Amino acid sequence: MRTFLYARVSVDDLTTQNQVEAVKRAGYEVKPSRVIEETISGATPAMDRPQFVKLVDKLEEGDCLVVTKIDRLGRDNIDVQKTVTMLLDMGVKLICLDLPVKDLSSAEGKLI
């Protein structure tokens, strides 16, 4: 299973390094080539973000995608729901570190 990290910040003066470090501390090993970093507003729909689209194109069934917070996927609840559903339908294991049930692809996670 390949593990990817999607790290997003909204403004140029912020860094994604804290997200990369949080994922490492949580025990996930992500190769540098699988860390997708993007500086773009969370209000921008996920599939309108160039780096996120490239990430989705790379993902295959059985891959794992880690985000530190659900808002890294977006700020609009409907868009986040669509994005989560799309990833799960692709067979991607989706991990969100700040949720009580971290694995959104699990039976419990799908209830969140």
Question: Which residues are covered by each model-predicted region?
Answer:
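Short, structured surface patches at the beginning of a domain
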Residues: 1-112
